[in-house]
Amino acid sequence: MAHVFLLGHRPRRNPSDRPANTYTTVTITKPEFVFGFQGQSKYSYCPSALKQADGTVHLYFCGNPENLIMVDNIFHIKINPDGTQTAAKSVLQPGVSGSWDDHHTCDPSVIEGSFTWKNTTYKYAMFFLSNMYGVYYNEIGVAFSNDLDADSWVKYPQQIVKKTWSSEGDQEIGGGGKSWGVGQPSVVSLDGKGKLLLTYTVGDIGGTRIVWAEADFSNMDTYSVSTPQTIVQTGLKAIDNQSRDYTCNSEFAIDKDADKIVMIRPVQPMPSDYPNYLNSSLEIDYMNLSDFTNQRGNWTPIYRITPDDTGYPRNHNATLLRDNFGHLQDWEEPEFYFTVSKATPDVQPSGSSHAEWTYHIWKSKVVKSK
């Protein structure tokens, strides 16, 4: 059974703050299955969802093309307004051996704009995480297309965000551990062209966090990314709803007219049983966009998605349903896509029993009522 948040009345402070209804009940619609490689030893997770004016949704996600082999590709399906889907196809793969991205290619975030490279102007950019064989850390790349239905995307050859340390190879963090690097990008258009709000996860000797930067990819010969800043984390609560939480692996979307930014994030810590690398719950939070970019203010929860809502013990790697520019149609009642997984004793880390083979994509929507 879904749990609810009760939001009390708050006074209007400025035109960007909509007055909340007294004792508004917030819940979510019954989650619906969207996609999974069912009956196969394959996973589908980390979605990026773009809603078109006619109701069509372009869904990009991470998957493995071969049974039992955990090598990430980025796949695409188109979900028609009547609910029918196109066949899943791999549209971005690891690079050639020896390249910076020759191992995994995952975590897509797709945006519309105007991006010029080698005298060609592209309409869409796909930001992604990748890494190479022989190292543990991740970095961020970008690829381009003029068609959301494209069978393949044109990769920019180098990383656009590199690891945070200058030395070659992995960064040791003690206890035999290694730094995760940078990845899990989320991009929002600021001008409908090449200027973007870029957020991504950092995992290094300084800890785990999400940072944001303003980027300009209008011309890839002279692209720029500002010095990243750690996002505001005030107001975020851990699984106990009391302890302060930290952020990683989150998706963002904005409503510029309302001056709001919305985030869907994992709630820490992760459970201790297998798979102990996936979160059980997700949360949707919001704050003023102007506060976010000025490093002030605090997050307010909209809804926390738990196993009671979904029927699955793990709920992770989520996205908000956005338009092509990363904007929300209704920031107060967003639709979202998320990944589920089974847990022990239903799965175990071996062969065809891995938890990964139960990664499927579902969707739901926040609903408010008086």
Description of each model-found segment:
Residues 46-48, 107-109, 184-186, 249-251, ...:
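Conserved beta-strand position repeated once per blade in WD40 beta-propeller domains
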